[in-house]
Regions:
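Major-groove DNA-recognition helix of helix-turn-helix-type DNA-binding domains
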Residues: 127-135
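Short amphipathic alpha-helical/adjacent loop interface patches that line ligand
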Residues: 57, 61, 130, 153
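Structural signal for hydrophobic
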Residues: 95, 137-138, 159
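Basic nucleic-acid-binding alpha-helical/helix-turn surface characteristic of O6-alkylguanine DNA
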Residues: 1-117, 165-175
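Helix-turn-helix DNA-binding helix
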Residues: 121-122
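Short Lys/Arg-enriched helix C-cap and helix-to-coil transition segments
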Residues: 134-142
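…primarily DNA-binding HTH/wHTH and HhH modules…
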Residues: 144-175
């Protein structure tokens, strides 16, 4: 008789329509592995069957929708950190503590808190954040302005408005 290790379940992926556009969520049995912002979400295949990964992806979808509707300030999700190295993970976890809902932190301050000397290195890590929104890289700003954002500055501005960090923009077109 041969013992065969059980096959790991395939990751589950879903795409959900939200107030900011389509968002993709990838989950494994370990937790949420990736969140894809609008423009990126269309590239992920929708997969998964009943099981822990599918349940995790569904829970993430509910929480992301609630957040984007202004009905949730924190996420209660298990995260799969397998796509990031230890330093990157430490920076992202520090970000979650340093910048809760409605609070920003500068690239330089996040660097000081994590021992990363160059704020540009923090910027690179934010651009490679596999879990945007859940790990709030949109709350990291430049010392003299918004800084960049993988989802674009318009989306960053909208998220900061949602959290009350920036005032809503006036609609001067009357639409």
């Amino acid at each position: 008789m041969t013992n065969v290790a059980p096959r790991a379940r395939s990751p589950a992926s879903i795409v959900l329509e939200t107030t900011i556009g389509a968002i993709g969520v990838e989950a494994t049995d370990e937790g949420v592995r990736r969140v894809h912002l609008p423009g990126d979400a269309a590239r992920i295949p929708v997969t998964g069957d009943a099981g822990p990964a599918s349940d995790t992806a569904d829970a993430a979808a509910v929480q992301l929708r609630d957040y984007l509707r202004g009905e949730r300030e924190t996420f209660d999700l298990t995260l799969d950190w397998s796509d990031v190295d230890q330093l990157h993970r430490r920076v992202l976890e520090t970000l979650c503590d340093a910048a809760p809902f409605g609070v920003t932190v500068t690239y330089g301050e996040l660097g000081r808190r994590t021992g990363v000397d160059d704020p540009r290195d923090i910027g690179v890590m934010m651009s490679r954040n596999p879990l945007p929104l859940v790990v709030p890289c949109h709350r990291v700003v430049a010392a003299d302005g918004l800084g960049g954002y993988g989802g674009g500055l318009d989306l960053k501005r909208r998220l900061l408005e949602l959290e009350g960090i920036l005032p809503p923009r006036l609609d001067l077109d009357g639409a």
